[in-house]
Amino acid sequence: MGREKKQEYALLTAWGASFIATLGSLYFSEIMKFEPCVLCWYQRIFMYPFVLWLGIAVAKKDYRIASYSLPIASIGACISLYHYAIQKVAAFSAAGAACGRVPCTGEYINWFGFVTIPFLALIGFITIAVCSFIVIKNK
């Protein structure tokens, strides 16, 4: 497979991940009526613009976006990892008790004993970061 095709598929995959993450986030808050905590809002702030940015980049085949999406997705992943640690690691849970109106330790979902909303966001951010890295490496 050619370099440009790899870049194209990686960029499209990153956009798809951001689109699915945004739809999932909106589903949980608007349909299921799960109120987001403060850290969830920060994750949304980092995730939602990717749908627009990466969508435009896919349409224009502008692979330069990867230079910007990699660090932004990495920051979002760090926030998600911290939020996940607050939920799952006892040493971090004390920090989440006073997170805001909704405690960051709350787990609206807990599929298979480990998949929570911050975990899903973490997977989305990691997918975007890895795809951005692939785009950069194939320049």
UniProtKB/Swiss-Prot annotation:
One of its GO terms (cellular component) is plasma membrane. The keyword Electron transport applies. The keyword Cell membrane applies. The chain crosses the membrane at residues 8-27, 42-61, 68-85, 113-135. GO terms for molecular function: protein-disulfide reductase activity. Pfam families: DsbB. It is found in: Cell membrane. Disulfide bonds join 37-40, 99-104. It is a multi-pass membrane protein. Keywords: Cell membrane, Chaperone, Disulfide bond, Electron transport, Membrane, Oxidoreductase, Redox-active center, Transmembrane, Transmembrane helix, Transport. GO terms for biological process: protein folding. InterPro entries: DiS_bond_form_DsbB/BdbC, Disulphide_bond_form_BdbC, DsbB-like_sf. Belongs to the DsbB family. BdbC subfamily. NCBIfam families: PRK03113.1 (NF002849). Required for disulfide bond formation in some proteins. HAMAP family: BdbC (MF_00287). This is Probable disulfide formation protein C. It comes from Bacillus cereus (strain ATCC 14579 / DSM 31 / CCUG 7414 / JCM 2152 / NBRC 15305 / NCIMB 9373 / NCTC 2599 / NRRL B-3711). The gene is bdbC.
